[in-house]
Amino acid sequence: MNLLSCSINTLRGLYDISGVEVGQHFYWQIGGFQVHGQVLITSWVVIAILLSSAAIAVRNPQTIPTDGQNFFEYVLEFIRDVSKTQIGEEYRPWVPFIGTMFLFIFVSNWSGALLPWKIIQLPHGELAAPTNDINTTVALALLTSVAYFYAGLTKKGLGYFSKYIQPTPILLPINILEDFTKPLSLSFRLFGNILADELVVVVLVSLVPLVVPIPVMFLGLFTSGIQALIFATLAAAYIGESMEGHH
């Protein structure tokens, strides 16, 4: 009887964990389109944070930088180094794009762990990091695809498409497929890591006291920063590859 009771309690515990909801959305109707309202809300918050930081950074620049100015200059220098390393000498026009990608993803990832989104109640679903939604990560990956197609066409014209039959026309289907797998791998890698991190924290909080998940939360902050760097680095690498024509 005790064994049966223990089994029932275990099943109840598993049922409680399975009650953690993934994928519920708060929808807005805009014209004939249905959009994810919670993603727009959190994205606007992230954009507001970035715009406010940019305004502070350029408000009163000093010849001898202050601590705050040193921080912003370090961030800019870091983004420039990533762009130059991956793209090459023609990196300057792409610094704003790579920087925007990196900062948006970085702040989005960290907002999921640091901002108390659950305080805001929605009719359906709940607020979370923008990158916790597959639509956001796919949109970022598609922007990257447009960017490296634009870079290749701008540099080489229609000759850019000759890469699809190199080194032999037999590889044409594989080379075309590669351009579809690049954005897919970018989007699913980012989405999967951020979603998994939030799910692990939620499950641990439901199973053990609050103190135990804290190391996991710090690990999540670290991996969130790494994911932003990986996305920006790969985006820059794809752009550099399309301009140079090498694999």
Swiss-Prot record:
Range of residues in the leader sequence: none
InterPro entries membership: ATP_syn_F0_a_bact/chloroplast, ATP_synth_F0_asu, ATP_synth_F0_asu_AS, F0_ATP_A_sf
Subcellular location: Plastid, Chloroplast thylakoid membrane
Residue ranges crossing the lipid bilayer per the database entry: 38-58, 95-115, 134-154, 199-219, 220-240
Assigned GO CC terms: chloroplast thylakoid membrane; plasma membrane; proton-transporting ATP synthase complex
Gene Ontology MF annotations: proton-transporting ATP synthase activity, rotational mechanism
SUPFAM superfamilies, per database record: F1F0 ATP synthase subunit A
Function: Key component of the proton channel; it plays a direct role in the translocation of protons across the membrane.
Protein name per Swiss-Prot or TrEMBL: ATP synthase subunit a, chloroplastic
Protein species of origin: Fagopyrum esculentum subsp. ancestrale (Wild buckwheat)
Underlying gene: atpI
